[in-house]
Amino acid sequence: MESRKNSDRQMRRANCFSAGERMKTRSPSVIVIGGGFGGISAARTLQDASFQVMVLESRDRIGGRVHTDYSFGFPVDLGASWLHGVCKENPLAPVIGRLGLPLYRTSGDNSVLYDHDLESYALFDMDGNQVPQELVTQIGVTFERILEEINKVRDEQDADISISQAFSIVFSRKPELRLEGLAHNVLQWYVCRMEGWFAADAETISAKCWDQEELLPGGHGLMVRGYRPVINTLAKGLDIRVGHRVTKIVRRYNGVKVTTENGQTFVADAAVIAVPLGVLKSGTIKFEPKLPEWKQEAINDLGVGIENKIILHFEKVFWPKVEFLGVVAETSYGCSYFLNLHKATGHPVLVYMPAGQLAKDIEKMSDEAAANFAVLQLQRILPDALPPVQYLVSRWGSDVNSMGSYSYDIVGKPHDLYERLRVPVDNLFFAGEATSSSFPGSVHGAYSTGLMAAEDCRMRVLERYGELDLFQPVMGEEGPASVPLLISRL
């Protein structure tokens, strides 16, 4: 009992946002933990609504799993790089449009490959022979038929099954869909791209929930100049403390106290927790009192996938003028996918993107070994491939600041876990892509949950002041006229 009194007394003596300052300025205070798109959008919105806001970020930069690198002399994204849903309905569209940032559209709506159309590509077998495009298109139709049959199978099942198990059931019922030889290998490449979308292996992806996210219209567009200009614009003027790794969050009726790894403490009326799901799963942030069981179950039961990038910068272009290259194989694990950034940016860059178990295995390699592995895959299809002059390797799975790439639905767990993770706990509010039931795993999903967390926080905190009309509305206010997105496809 005495320790709780001491804790409350410490909060009243806040050295960051003191009670006296709050009474004088009538501005409530919020600590935002995590400087990714979810955290920054929440902080931006709350500060614009006259809150005192501080952002604590563990890295030495903002952006989180959005990381634009300039070491090649031009921008490349090591993390998220697509705008999923190139349309005015996308919550990020107004920001991107006003900045005049160009996008390169890689697919339209309802593409069998999600973020690519079957319009500009080259697939090869392990011997370097190009796969006929007619066969690729034909297998694409078969893949869509299999997915339709999977949906029928899952609707008949009481218990959830994995996508991999569902494939087996479909093949037993519809043997004509079972393929052999090169056709089978092409089908495995489609599975490989599906696994890339979820950053997970088919053995772990839920058949009941795999298609529950909302896909905005307009297809998918690459951010030609990277995402950094967007996050920097949103963060302008915010009080952001980088290098502040949070280790403990104490919540009481009269506020929150946040402790960082170096022993610093900060207090405020409320906190927005916008760290990656993988970090919450790791338990490196201690909560006092513990989070309620329903919240902890949501953290435990949501899946976190891994997709990495090995970005290869070459002296010149030596590959076909297509949007992507691929290698087909007997298993999805053996397949490869290279994104051709030259089509979008004009720079001689290929991006090798492994996901799931393959990504985990590559993370065990050194950067040099990982780059050599990617080049080896490239040499399977282009024997005269040049060595890269520079390379970059992401490690989202082993990075202590992320512990994974993005969330997905695992077998046997309900899709409403995303919403459960978003729901506030007293004066703790949650944001990030893993709290978006409509747009999980996306930048605009993280951004939109930051807006929602800010609104929830605003309403709860300001109720204590009893003067909601003193502050600007956070959401739904009229902003400047939207600017059309700059979209190209060469």
Swiss-Prot record:
Induction trigger: By abscisic acid, jasmonate, salicylic acid, wounding and flagellin 22, a pathogen elicitor.
Binding of FAD, residues: 57, 65, 246, 433
InterPro entries linked to this entry: Amino_oxidase (IPR002937), FAD/NAD-bd_sf (IPR036188), Flavin_amine_oxidase (IPR001613), Flavin_monoamine_oxidase (IPR050281)
SUPFAM superfamilies xref list: FAD-linked reductases, C-terminal domain (SSF54373), FAD/NAD(P)-binding domain (SSF51905)
Keyword Oxidoreductase: yes
CC per GO annotation: peroxisome
EC number assigned by the record: 1.5.3.-
Protein name: Polyamine oxidase 2
